[in-house]
Each structure stands twice: as C-alpha cells, then as structure tokens.
Amino acid sequence: MLRIAGRRASSLSRWPVRSVAPSSSAFISANHFSSDDDSSSPRSISPSLASVFLHHTRGFSSNSVSHAHDMGLVPDLPPTVAAIKNPTSKIVYDEHNHERYPPGDPSKRAFAYFVLTGGRFVYASLVRLLILKFVLSMSASKDVLALASLEVDLSSIEPGTTVTVKWRGKPVFIRRRTEDDINLANSVDLGSLRDPQQDAERVKSPEWLVVIGVCTHLGCIPLPNAGDFGGWFCPCHGSHYDISGRIRKGPAPYNLEVPTYSFLEENKLLIG
C-alpha cells in the first residue's frame, strides 16, 4: 500500500504548478494536508501538490451541499440556496417586504361606513326595480285587459229590442226580453230540442239574454228578430234559433254560446 501511495504522489509531483491567487474564493487550509507525523511520512503533501489538487478540485466543485463543502474546498452557499437545500419549519419574514401599514384615521371611519351602507341601499333598490320590471312584463297589457272584458250600459236598451256589441273580436247579442218572450221560452218542451237546455240555465236575469252572435254551424252571424221562432236566423244555411238562443231548426248542432258576464249594477253589464 505504501508503495502504491508513493507512486501516485510522485506522479502528481510531475504536474505543472499553477499559482493560486490569494483572493480566490476557495482556500485550502494547511491542516487538511499536514499531519502530526514528520515530513518524511508518505501521508504528508507538499504545498505545490496542494495547489495542484485544489486546481483540479475546483473544476468539479459547485455551490451544492456536498462532501467537498464539508472539507472546506468550496465557499459557503448563498443564503437563498442554503434555505432551499436545507428546509426548516421556522418561518422568517422579510421585514422590508412585509411592513404593516399604519392604522387609519379614526375620524374617517364614519364616512367610510356611510358610503358602504349607502351603496348597499342603492344596489338593493336597483335589484328591486329589476325584479318589479320583470314581474310586470309578464302581466297582460292594457290593450289585452281592455279586450278581455267589456262594460255595457243597459239603460238605453228598450224592451223587445236587441243590441249588438263587440267583445274579443266577436259580436255579442244583448236582448231585453218582454214578459211574453220569457213565457214563450219557458213553455218549450225540452224533449223536442236538439241541444236540450232550460231557459233558466242560460240567463242570470229573465229580462236579459246575452249570447255570442256566431252560428254554431259554420260561424256565420245570425240576424236578430228573424226566423220561424222569433229569435235569430242564420242566412248562410238556414238555422233557426228561438228567443232563448236555442237551436230549433236547421243544420246548426248546438245552441248559441253564452259568454261569461255579470251585473255590476242594475243597468251595468260586464262581459268577460
């Protein structure tokens, strides 16, 4: 073993010696190459050999944590690299980047609260308006409501006459019946009717008859105070209706339709 070490030392002594600047970041202490034994010991290394070894060692050194760093052959790591390679649970803050802002002026807090509260009320009002606008947009317009119902004044209608009004695009017959008309309507045998229906089922007041003026056959408009039964006559196909609007003769299959209506007052009628 001693012979092998001597041969290696003699081969290293032949390498050219390069001067090392004293300002180099890497410095090798003599303690790493000296021994308690005398200089004649094979383990002692001359300063020139140390410089050569340093030169070749620096070519493979880095700033990472390694065995060479433990031997003092490389300088200390930068703080950032050392923190990354040696993590710790201790948190150290940079006081320069984490400075606390000074507390605000207490006299201005009331103004800030007022502004924030006022903004909330404004936002709530806007949301309320949007909701109301959406709900109201779903309701029917005034034109549609006007067409949905019709108010009629009955005071100008004479007994025994018929008035025609327009409701939802259809004609409506309003007849003020006399006592003879009422008695005639109640004297009809229901068994002889194509669409059996009592007169009391078709009127809310015996004096007033309200029916839609559209023939139930093909949609023609019957003529009032005409026909074989004193009611209405359809000139299109010859259907005859009595004084209660019931079909008595002709091709029409059903009686004249009775719309939804009510009496607001004695002489006020609301259709629809």
UniProtKB/Swiss-Prot annotation:
EC number: 7.1.1.8
Gene3D superfamilies xref list: Rieske [2Fe-2S] iron-sulphur domain
Transit peptide segment: 1-60
Pfam families assigned to the protein according to its UniProt record, in alphabetical order: Rieske, UCR_TM
Keywords, ordered alphabetically: 2Fe-2S, Disulfide bond, Electron transport, Iron, Iron-sulfur, Membrane, Metal-binding, Mitochondrion, Mitochondrion inner membrane, Respiratory chain, Transit peptide, Translocase, Transmembrane, Transmembrane helix, Transport
All residue ranges annotated as the Rieske domain in the record: 182-270
Cofactor note: Binds 1 [2Fe-2S] cluster per subunit.
Tissues where the protein occurs: High levels are seen in the flowers while a low level expression is seen in the roots, leaves and stems.
An example molecular function term from Gene Ontology annotations: metal ion binding
Disulfide bonding pattern of the chain: C220-C236
Gene Ontology biological process terms, A to Z: mitochondrial electron transport, ubiquinol to cytochrome c
Biological role: Component of the ubiquinol-cytochrome c oxidoreductase, a multisubunit transmembrane complex that is part of the mitochondrial electron transport chain which drives oxidative phosphorylation.
Annotated protein name in UniProt: Cytochrome b-c1 complex subunit Rieske-2, mitochondrial
Organism: Nicotiana tabacum (Common tobacco)
Upper classification of the organism: Eukaryota, Viridiplantae, Streptophyta, Embryophyta, Tracheophyta
